[in-house]
Amino acid sequence: MKTRYSVLSVAMTAAFYTQYAQADLREQCLLGVPHFQGEEVTGDQTMMPIEIEADNAVINQPKDATYTGDVAIKQGNRSLFADEVRVEQNGEQERRAFLKGSYRYQDNLVQAHGRDAAMDLGSETAELQNTEFQLVGRQGRGTAESGLFNHNKRILKNATFTACLPNDNAWSIEGNEMIQHIDEEYAEIWHARFKVLGMPVFYSPYLQFPIGDRRRSGLLIPNFHRSSKDGFAYSQPFYWNIAPNMDATITPTYYSRRGWQISPEYRYLTKLGEGIVAGEYIGKDRLDEYRPDDNDRKRYLMHWRHNMSFLTGWRLYVDYTKVSDKRYFSDFDSEYGSSTDGYATQQFKLGYYQPNYNLSISGKKFQTFDELDVGPYRVLPQIDFNYYNDELVKGGDFKLFAQTARFENDSKLMPKAWRFHVEPTLNFPLANRYGSLNFETKLYATHYLQEKGSSKQADDMDKNVTRIIPQVKVDLQTVLEADKQLFKGFNQTFEPRVQYVYRPYKDQSNIGSGLNQSVSFGYDSALLQSDYFSLFNDRRYSGLDRISSANLITAGGTNRFFNEKTGVEVFNFSIGQTYYLSPSKIDDLSQNSTTKRSSSWALESNWKFHRKWNWHGAYQYDTRLNQTSLANTSLQYKPSQDKLVQLSYRFASKDYINQNLRSNTYGQDIKQVGAVVGWELTDRVAFMASHYHDIALKKPVESQLSVNYNTCCWSANVYVARKLTATPIGSPDTINDLYYDNKFGVNFELRFGTNYSSGVRKMLKKGMIPYTEQYGIN
């Protein structure tokens, strides 16, 4: 009988057997580079005294002197060692040292050795012949037939350079002339030949590369992958360091089944703010499965993110993402969106902020990827005003929120509207060492100016709608500490909370159209998803178009356990439920009303039973349907930042999905298990493996395996992945018809002594379902 092992099980086993990696890679790499001995001195080196030591000296004052036998010349931070040195002096104007035979030169930035050299003792300049050099305190070494070294520049002839340690010739760059700019931390090279293991693989008439922490313009290492959908793909990124405050990366990619894609990305930091502008473009997608229109097969993405603070109190925020079609994120991996998001956001906000008030104008639009007859509304403009004053009423905190918004929809069936909203709130908080009591009154006052859709089939609308709803809320909280320990070594607290909310009923069916209830109610309201903490929200719906009636009591509590010695929280458990004294509704339709006297039970818990172990669980029981509506749990072992194992499970009933997503076509429960391993096996090898499986469908959702190999001067990543993808056009699209994209890829990275990461965190971010942490105790 043969035994079968999954990739993930082998990966998890390997992880547990390599809990102790070798010494940190950075420490190992820096052990292989020279370090400056002694104390660095600052100031003009040429004005510092010259110390000369030698076994013998022949001095011909005042013109020259010849020193032989273990000669050492020291001035400031630089030293020169040779068998024979002749020093010539021309009055006080010039002092030069000439070295015959082998020599060693060192300062606080570089060490070198070779044959024959000259050093100007009055200008910090050294001319070195047939030299081998190595940077001090960082990776970088090379050779040159001749070199002119000074305090801010090294000019090398017929030179080589590599960031690899001695005796490691993994890669190198050769050129007829190389100029190393010390302060700017980059090098220029002419007629550059890039070699791997001594074999030339690339030529460029001119090239720049970093010799420090700052990035420089030039070609980056290409990436390769092959997938069942794209075919073979080759990416060649080019980095452009435009200025100290702005740069760009331009990446052409060739897909054998799709054609050429160009992906520019521009990053900036100016007085007008900081942000990123990016794009992805294919002029004509050749893939036969993609046939929306044979005359228009362009695929593109546009992205702009901007943050700006200016004058006093002014802020501007822009987040704009637009794609050519609904399938874009299913077909292409992108940093600017994912197929699991379901939409792309296009929004901006300009605001003025002061300590007790703020004013903003904004706009927002969603590009959805679902097949919907009627999409969500766009809002432009939206003007918000917030005002705070805790001295207006004695013992009370006054707050005022006001908004004006304009809503429009692409569908001619849908109405347009202006919404004017005012929401004053008055809080009376009371608190002492036993707990807190907050009494709140609020008024929702809203007026709508509605315009019927332009289509003849559009619903008739009330042109003017006014809605005024008062609200009263009482919130009581306290913290009780147990006198006795339930478990030895752990102190226990219980935090009960009771909240009462009252709002009268107002029929709101005349606000907006019922045609888009698969997306929202009215113009921007949707039923909120619930968990323990959302039980204490004032409202069941987001936005302002649906404010349900309320006559309810919410009761809950959190039990916490703390380590008696350290005071650190190790366990908590929360449970709560809402009790409806009368049905909560927004109109006369039964499906939009609470029919039971109580809501779902909501439970949430976190347990850190060891500093390396975390557990989280959440559960909701629907009392209306007498069944579980939501559940999720995850267990994580994380001994360090680059070592973790996580197991997870999530469940959502089809009734809960249908209630919260009217356009749902899933037709059954979601039952999904997942496992993720990210582990630094040694200082050089790390891997990530993940697998998500749908129990209901009995089919995988996504599987990944990625291995990273790191050295001091390069790293390589090899990965395989299999994930669900969009249904090809013209193919069957039922619950049992699932389509996968299989991918294999290789990425290389040159390291110039500035990046020693294992790559685990980068690998964890990849995939359709990226790794997340949701633990309430850290």
Curated annotation (Swiss-Prot):
GO terms (BP aspect): Gram-negative-bacterium-type cell outer membrane assembly; lipopolysaccharide transport
Signal peptide: 1-23
Keyword vocabulary terms for this entry: Cell outer membrane, Membrane, Signal
Predominant location category: membrane
InterPro entries attached to this UniProt entry: LipoPS_assembly_LptD (IPR020889), LptD (IPR050218), LptD_C (IPR007543), OstA-like_N (IPR005653)
Disulfide bond annotation, renumbered to this chain: none
Protein localization: Cell outer membrane
Gene3D superfamilies tied to this protein: Lipopolysaccharide (LPS) transport protein A like domain
GO cellular-component term (any): cell outer membrane
Pfam families given in the database record: LptD, LptD_N
Function as written in the Swiss-Prot or TrEMBL entry: Together with LptE, is involved in the assembly of lipopolysaccharide (LPS) at the surface of the outer membrane.
Family (UniProt): Belongs to the LptD family.
Record's subunit section: Component of the lipopolysaccharide transport and assembly complex. Interacts with LptE and LptA.
Name of the protein described by the UniProt record: LPS-assembly protein LptD
Organism phylogeny: Bacteria, Pseudomonadati, Pseudomonadota, Gammaproteobacteria, Pasteurellales
